[in-house]
């Protein structure tokens, strides 16, 4: 199946060079409907879900709006992911013109035909550039076109397609022993493989140093939380977990880490967070690879049968692009000083609101402890655009590094 898709993508590139974008459209529809019927409707693998995913693309109504030059404004297509059981009588017909059959094949391939293993490791880099792994943990994860907040329970899933999420709901238990200290870094690697384990390739790699995590953590320490702790005579219990989003190399997806301070038995309010809106922090997220022994957990439920989201036209065009194979090679290079501040790290916090922060901000800097302390670094999820996963699977096929 992977070979057939790769060959079709190659033929498409050749056809575009010969006769332009509009050539062989009907031929391509025949190919993708045949692929969908053959590999998902007729062939049922032993571990394959009894579900089919369809990407429906419609034109939204624009009314009488027009552009500055007088032309009629084109409507942004509305994308809807529909989910049906294989034996449902409501399955869309193979000739349905509103179904994007190519994307439907690719989505079902990523969700059902591949296995995924994520590895989180605490490492150090030697002077020669080699990576030394001190401890690591691997966990099987599942691809989903939907997401839900990791800092709250019971919230309904929302559509994320074309971004695919690999979530670890029990991240605090799975990565309970992942602590990072001075001079160390946290490395994340996500690997895809087929059901027979004949194919294996890295689809995400990233790393972040302890110093960057600690800087984020320190900058989120909440003066308001400290004051509330004192004024409530200890009855106020703060939550000291921060969610740090790490961008992948060259913007290739991102991973989220739940960061908290390892308790030392000190009950003082040092180490609480600033719960003000996320302040911009920057850390270069470099690349690399993934997994040893998997631990299976139950596959999560997928979301509602019909999920809608408008996708800009330029995003659709972007999904069709091929991407270079060197997205992950920066992990092997030495950090270049000031360049470490180029990738923004977005933060989310589930701490107390920062009331009075502006009044006592300078006092915070004076009273903050300068010493280093251990941090928990729990991986919560990895997310990647569908087209980047396809490119890594079909073209790049980078070998894992963390897997031994």
Swiss-Prot record:
Which segments show compositional bias classed as Polar residues? 262-278
Residue ranges of region Disordered?
A: 262-307, 320-340
Q: What residues bear Phosphothreonine in this entry?
A: 290, 293
Native organism is Rattus norvegicus
Name of the protein in its database record:
Uncharacterized protein KIAA0930 homolog
Say yes or no: keyword Phosphoprotein present. Answer: yes
Q: Which residues carry this modification: Phosphoserine?
A: 268, 276, 279, 304, 306, 324, 358, 362
Annotated transmembrane regions: none
